[in-house]
């Protein structure tokens, strides 16, 4: 299948640069995956599409302020590191900018010396393995010195860091937010629970690969990046019981979806586990556990629009995106939402 089949026209002004004042007032496009019928709602109306006994699956990862800007020891030359994943206690795989400054053995300082770093390895893909030196707890040091790694298409400064976190974020480790979850408020989640709808959590730490363009012509030739996931025994039992009852599993976001589909066996059962996934879901894939999906509007030719098209049908999804552009929906991380029912 050709990557170009997932291209669409998107005016730049529809790329949301900031979140709405109230999370759940974003617009919601409801797409019937069987008929292709579209309705236009607000996100707080999502509760009307969930039934007692259904389970909503949320990704509780938390975005780290993983962008560090510092100086090279001795010369004062600027360096920027973006932390991607921890490889040992104080060693992280990072992107470095400018790369030529980040050679093995080079040392850097951040925040008046509160944090120091040394490049210990350059990987084949150009990423650096960096060892950090500090006093106290690394996460607290990072919290005081780091900046949020916003997506490349967001050009405005984010005034409130928490607006790039879900209200239920808990497990530190992501380089990007699981953006479908940004629409939920604590009040809306309480209302959902009060209606007898279950809430289960997965953890998938979103990597920067989520923003990387597909650089091949044929979908089947694309290789996905790997991301760490975890599912607890308790949450696995809630999901399995939902399927057994004949209720629906509604996945919030492509990250929750990829986690569940990685873990599920052929009968759609999930179990407590953790690991790394590079699952690539594109048309032809048969879903094992996810019945419905809440998601944002994604980039043209992205692996995310391919996943959405797998659940709802490519023709239905491309028609829906055309309608979203016509109706001036807001796109990408801080944009509006779609519910595939």
From Swiss-Prot:
Pathway: tRNA modification; tRNA-queuosine biosynthesis. GO terms for cellular component: cytoplasm. InterPro entries: QueA (IPR003699), QueA_dom1 (IPR042118), QueA_dom2 (IPR042119), QueA_sf (IPR036100). The keyword Methyltransferase does not apply. Its EC number is 2.4.99.17. Keywords: Cytoplasm, Queuosine biosynthesis, S-adenosyl-L-methionine, Transferase. It holds the Pfam family Queuosine_synth. It catalyses: 7-aminomethyl-7-carbaguanosine(34) in tRNA + S-adenosyl-L-methionine = epoxyqueuosine(34) in tRNA + adenine + L-methionine + 2 H(+). One of its GO terms (molecular function) is S-adenosylmethionine:tRNA ribosyltransferase-isomerase activity. One of its GO terms (biological process) is tRNA wobble guanine modification. Signal peptide: none annotated. It is found in: Cytoplasm. It is an enzyme of class 2 (transferase). Belongs to the QueA family. Transfers and isomerizes the ribose moiety from AdoMet to the 7-aminomethyl group of 7-deazaguanine (preQ1-tRNA) to give epoxyqueuosine (oQ-tRNA). Monomer. This is S-adenosylmethionine:tRNA ribosyltransferase-isomerase.
């Amino acid at each position: 299948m050709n990557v170009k089949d997932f291209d669409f026209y998107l005016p730049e002004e529809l790329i949301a640069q900031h979140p709405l004042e109230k999370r759940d007032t974003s617009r919601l496009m409801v797409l019937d995956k069987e008929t292709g019928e579209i309705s236009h709602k607000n996100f707080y109306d999502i509760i009307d599409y969930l039934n007692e006994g259904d389970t909503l699956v949320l990704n509780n990862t938390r975005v780290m302020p993983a962008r560090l800007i510092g100086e090279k020891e001795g010369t004062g030359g600027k360096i920027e590191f973006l932390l991607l994943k921890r490889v040992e206690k104080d060693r992280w795989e990072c992107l470095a900018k400018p790369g030529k400054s980040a050679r093995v053995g080079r040392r850097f300082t951040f925040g008046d010396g509160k944090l120091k770093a040394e490049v210990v390895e350059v990987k084949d893909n150009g990423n650096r393995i960096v060892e950090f030196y500090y006093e106290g707890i690394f996460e607290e040091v990072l919290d005081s010195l780091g900046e949020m790694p916003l997506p490349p298409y967001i050009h405005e400064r984010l005034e409130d860091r928490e607006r790039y976190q879900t209200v239920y974020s808990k497990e530190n480790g992501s380089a990007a937010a699981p953006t479908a979850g940004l629409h939920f408020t604590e009040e809306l989640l309480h209302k959902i629970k009060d209606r007898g709808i279950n809430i289960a959590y997965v953890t998938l730490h979103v990597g920067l690969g989520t923003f990387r363009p597909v650089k091949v012509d044929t979908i089947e030739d694309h290789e996905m990046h790997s991301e760490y996931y975890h599912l607890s025994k308790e949450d696995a039992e809630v999901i399995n019981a939902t399927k057994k009852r004949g209720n629906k599993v509604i996945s919030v976001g492509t990250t929750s979806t990829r986690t569940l589909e990685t873990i599920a066996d052929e009968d759609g059962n999930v179990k407590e586990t953790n690991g790394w996934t590079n699952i690539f879901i594109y048309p032809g894939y048969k879903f094992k556990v996810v019945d419905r999906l809440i998601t944002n509007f994604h980039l043209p030719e992205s692996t995310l629009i391919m996943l959405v098209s797998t659940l709802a049908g490519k023709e239905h999804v491309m028609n829906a995106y055309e309608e979203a552009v016509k109706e001036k929906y807001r796109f990408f991380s801080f944009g509006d939402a779609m519910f595939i029912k």
